[in-house]
């Protein structure tokens, strides 16, 4: 099983190999989730020629750490940098960074800080509105201390293709601030009626997966 050493211990990740993949998604799950929750998503992406790698956040799945304390956002961004480095070394094809919920906040923070370089594209799902105000989400334990945020929305690399997917009925992260942020950031925005926070585990999951895979395919073909 693949692991890498982070500053906080050994972190596990999972890979679903795809022969002659055109792109790879490096997924940062949400709070309380791990790579084992994403077999169905991996299958859907794989059918479209996109390979999935997913991280077990510290304290989740097979990764070391405390399950109730995933870390500050700064620590999570450091973990993401190590994971993306592993993906880049093993993939040899364009890498799309993706995050769900806390993972979306981590992806945005890591891009803002330059820790993960510039991926081929970015997909965020269930994005916490707090991160769009420059505040770490509450699910990042202890995030208020030494998080390094300036109170401004995270900056995206110029020209980075971005897809934002969000459920209309998301009660954890209301859609309106995310829709407005996507508009001002020049991101492509997809919303899903009768869907909540965890789009990849709801009845709309097949549609969401197809939309993500299709967007990646078009983005890669236009490179």
Residue map of PLM features:
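Primarily recognizes the serine-hydrolase "nucleophile elbow" in alpha/beta-hydrolase
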Residues: 92-139
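Active-site glycine-rich loops that stabilize anionic/oxyanionic intermediates
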Residues: 30-33, 168
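Catalytic active-site module of serine/aspartate enzymes centered on a nucleophile-bearing elbow/loop
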Residues: 194-223
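Conserved alpha/beta-hydrolase
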Residues: 37, 42-65
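Conserved loop-alpha-helix segment in the C-terminal half of the alpha/beta-hydrolase fold
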Residues: 168-188
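N-terminal cap/lid segment of alpha/beta-hydrolase-fold proteins
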Residues: 1-20
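Short beta-strand/loop motif that positions the catalytic acidic residue
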Residues: 158, 164-166, 170
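Alpha/beta-hydrolase active-site loop
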Residues: 70-89
């Amino acid at each position: 099983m693949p692991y890498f050493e982070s500053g906080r211990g050994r972190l596990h990740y999972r890979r679903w190999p795809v022969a002659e993949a055109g792109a790879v998604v490096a997924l940062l799950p949400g709070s309380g989730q791990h790579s084992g929750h994403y077999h169905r998503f991996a299958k859907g992406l794989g059918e479209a020629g996109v390979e999935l790698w997913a991280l077990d956040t510290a304290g989740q799945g097979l990764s070391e750490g405390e399950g109730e304390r995933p870390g500050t956002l700064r620590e999570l961004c450091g973990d993401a940098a190590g994971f993306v480095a592993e993906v880049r070394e093993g993939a040899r094809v364009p890498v799309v960074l993706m995050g769900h919920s806390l993972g979306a906040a981590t992806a945005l923070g890591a891009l803002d800080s330059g820790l993960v370089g510039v991926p081929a594209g970015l997909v965020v799902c269930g994005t916490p509105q707090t991160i769009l105000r420059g505040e770490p989400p509450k699910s990042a334990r202890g995030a208020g201390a030494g998080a390094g945020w300036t109170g401004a929305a995270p900056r995206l690399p110029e020209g980075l293709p971005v897809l934002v997917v969000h459920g209309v009925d998301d009660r954890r992260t209301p859609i309106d601030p995310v829709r407005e942020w996507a508009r001002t950031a020049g991101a492509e925005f997809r919303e899903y009626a009768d869907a909540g926070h965890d789009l990849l585990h709801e009845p709309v999951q097949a549609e969401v997966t197809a939309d993500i895979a299709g967007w990646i395919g078009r983005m890669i073909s236009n490179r």
